C-alpha cells in the first residue's frame, strides 16, 4: 500500500482506515518532514454502537479524517467483511506513545490537553525526559465552558503541530472539532485515559493479553463495573455473525 493510497473499510457506516501496522500509520502521518493535519479517533465496537444511537457523535466521527481500528473487534469485523485485507489493530495508547517518540526526534511542537493537573504535569515531565518532546503548551481538563475559547487561542498562539486531547468520548471529539475552527493547521488526536496509563496511574493489560486480543477482558476483570458496557457489545457480535457489518 502506498502512503497516500490507504484503503478504507466501511463498518456500520463508519469508514475506517486500513493501516497494516503501526509503522505504516506513522509513516503516513509523518511524511517529508511534514505532519498530516486532521482529527484522529480510535474506533472500537462500543463507539460504533454508541454512534448508532447518538446522531451528534455519528456526525463527529463522520467528519474526522482518521478513524482507525483501536479495538480487536473492529479488526476482526473488517477481516470478516473484507477477506485478505492487511489491516491490523493499532491501539490508541501505543500509537500516542509512538507519535510522541517520533515527534521528539523531529522536534515537532506538541500541545497536551486534558487530565488532572498532577497527571498532566507528570506526563509532560516524562515526555521531556524520555523522548525530549517539544511541548509548547498544556491545559488540564478542568476548565469551564466560558474558558474554552481562551484555551483554543492559547493552542493557536503556541503554533502546535500536534494536539492530543484526553477528555473521554465524546467530549474530546467535540473539543477537537471546535478547536480546529481556530487552529486548523494541526493534527488532533483523542487519547482518552492515555495520560493515566503513561504515568503509571492506570495499568494496561499484560502484553500477552493484548496480543491475544483480550485487553477488554482484562479491563472487565479489573473493573467489574464495566459489565453493563460489555453486555452492550452483544449487539455487535450479532452484527458480526449475521453479516450486517
UniProtKB/Swiss-Prot annotation:
**Similarity comment: family membership:** Belongs to the glycosyltransferase 26 family.
Q: Report the HAMAP family cross-referenced here.
A: WecG_RffM
| Protein name per UniProt | UDP-N-acetyl-D-mannosaminuronic acid transferase
Function recorded in the entry: Catalyzes the synthesis of Und-PP-GlcNAc-ManNAcA (Lipid II), the second lipid-linked intermediate involved in enterobacterial common antigen (ECA) synthesis.
What Pfam family does this protein match (any one)?
A: Glyco_tran_WecG
Q: Which reaction does it catalyse?
A: UDP-N-acetyl-alpha-D-mannosaminouronate + N-acetyl-alpha-D-glucosaminyl-di-trans,octa-cis-undecaprenyl diphosphate = beta-D-ManNAcA-(1->4)-alpha-D-GlcNAc-di-trans,octa-cis-undecaprenyl diphosphate + UDP + H(+)
Keywords from the UniProt entry: Glycosyltransferase, Transferase
**GO terms, molecular function:** lipopolysaccharide N-acetylmannosaminouronosyltransferase activity
Q: Which InterPro entries does the annotation name? A: UDP-ManNAcA_Trfase_WecG, WecG_TagA_CpsF
Query: Which cysteines does the record link by disulfide bonds?
Result: none
Does the keyword Glycosyltransferase belong to this entry? Answer: yes
| GO process annotations (BP) | enterobacterial common antigen biosynthetic process
> Is the keyword Transferase in the record?
yes
Named in its record, the pathway it takes part in is:
Bacterial outer membrane biogenesis; enterobacterial common antigen biosynthesis
* Entry EC number(s): 2.4.1.180
Amino acid at each position: 500500500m502506498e502512503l497516500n493510497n490507504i484503503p478504507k473499510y466501511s463498518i456500520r457506516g463508519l469508514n475506517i482506515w486500513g493501516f497494516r501496522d503501526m509503522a505504516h500509520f506513522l509513516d503516513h502521518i509523518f511524511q517529508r518532514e511534514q505532519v498530516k493535519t486532521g482529527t484522529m479517533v480510535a474506533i472500537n465496537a462500543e463507539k460504533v454502537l454508541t454512534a448508532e444511537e447518538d446522531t451528534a457523535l455519528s456526525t463527529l466521527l463522520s467528519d474526522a479524517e482518521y478513524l482507525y481500528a483501536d479495538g480487536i473487534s473492529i479488526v476482526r469485523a473488517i477481516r470478516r467483511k473484507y477477506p485478505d485485507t492487511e489491516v491490523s489493530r493499532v491501539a490508541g495508547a501505543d500509537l500516542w506513545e509512538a507519535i510522541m517518540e517520533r515527534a521528539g526526534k523531529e522536534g515537532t511542537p506538541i500541545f497536551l490537553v486534558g487530565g488532572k493537573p498532577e497527571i498532566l504535569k507528570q506526563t509532560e515531565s516524562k515526555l521531556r525526559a524520555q523522548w525530549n518532546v517539544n511541548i509548547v503548551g498544556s491545559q488540564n481538563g478542568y476548565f469551564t465552558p466560558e474558558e474554552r475559547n481562551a484555551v483554543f487561542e492559547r493552542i493557536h498562539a503556541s503554533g502546535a503541530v500536534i494536539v492530543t486531547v484526553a477528555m473521554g468520548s465524546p467530549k474530546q471529539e467535540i473539543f477537537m472539532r471546535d478547536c480546529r475552527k481556530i487552529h486548523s493547521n494541526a493534527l488532533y488526536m483523542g487519547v482518552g485515559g492515555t495520560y493515566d496509563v503513561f504515568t503509571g496511574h492506570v495499568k494496561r493489560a499484560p502484553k500477552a493479553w493484548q496480543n491475544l486480543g483480550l485487553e477488554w477482558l482484562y479491563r472487565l476483570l479489573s473493573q467489574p463495573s464495566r459489565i453493563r458496557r460489555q453486555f452492550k457489545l452483544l449487539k455487535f457480535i450479532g452484527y458480526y455473525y449475521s453479516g450486517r457489518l
